[in-house]
Curated annotation (Swiss-Prot):
Keyword line: DNA damage, DNA repair, Hydrolase
Protein's recorded name: Putative 3-methyladenine DNA glycosylase
Species of provenance: Bacillus subtilis (strain 168)
Disulphide bridges, residue numbers: none
Pfam families: Pur_DNA_glyco
Biological processes annotated in GO: base-excision repair
Coiled-coil region(s): none
InterPro entries the record matches: Formyl_transferase-like_C_sf, MPG, MPG_sf
SUPFAM superfamilies linked: FMT C-terminal domain-like
GO molecular function: alkylbase DNA N-glycosylase activity; DNA binding
EC number: 3.2.2.-
Cited NCBIfam families: 3mg (TIGR00567), PRK00802.1-2 (NF002002)
Length: 196
């Protein structure tokens, strides 16, 4: 039986990254591949606020081949590679306002056998409890760069409303001056799949 697909509308993403990051918590991230469909509930995100955010790739409106998609319309997929891992971001805000939300962790839902094959020798908790881990488990690649997050094969659906959301500093941005202390990481309080 094929699952019904009901992606969130593009208007959902037309807000600042600081507003979008917590609103994505509890939503279902879905990736369809030739091997099958895998999905998980988003449990951790980080907001990157663009021109004035030293931790953002688009700080000072820096435009490169890699960051160009951050200047596009809200709802575009921004993938990049860090330490051989693909990381998944969703572009926020309006065109030419280069903001994005990094998806840091998901709670596995569909396609858990696929995730296990893609993340062999690891416990279920370790399949998706980090930004490079979840993309491997779902099958997200650089080929997804620039897609609409509202269309197959990579999209987000509504899920559940978290009982509580925690905030704190973003991870791995020690060289970003005062921006390293901004409480722009959001996670579902107490969820075991949060990265740390």
């Amino acid at each position: 039986m094929t699952r019904e697909k009901n992606p969130l509308p593009i208007t959902f993403y037309q807000k600042t990254a600081l507003e979008l990051a917590p609103s994505l918590l509890g939503c279902l991230l879905v990736k369809e591949t030739d091997e099958g469909t895998a999905s998980g509930y988003i449990v951790e995100t980080e907001a990157y606020m663009g021109a004035g955010d030293r931790a953002a790739h688009s700080f000072n409106n820096r435009r490169t081949k890699r960051t160009e998609i951050m200047f596009a319309e809200a709802g575009r997929v921004y993938t990049y590679v860090m330490h051989t891992h693909t990381l998944l971001n969703v572009v926020a805000a309006e065109e030419d306002v280069p903001q994005a939300v990094l998806i840091r962790a998901i709670e596995p839902h569909e396609g858990q056998l696929l995730m296990e094959e893609r993340r062999p020798g690891r416990s279920p908790r370790e399949w998706t409890n980090g930004p490079g881990k979840l993309t491997k488990a779902l099958g997200v690649t650089m080929n997804d760069y620039g897609r609409w997050i509202t269309e197959q094969p990579l999209y987000i659906e509504s899920g559940y409303t978290p009982e509580a959301i925690s905030t704190g500093p973003r991870i791995g941005i020690d060289n970003s001056g005062e921006a390293r202390d901004y409480p722009w990481r959001f996670w579902v309080t107490g969820n075991r799949y949060v990265s740390r």
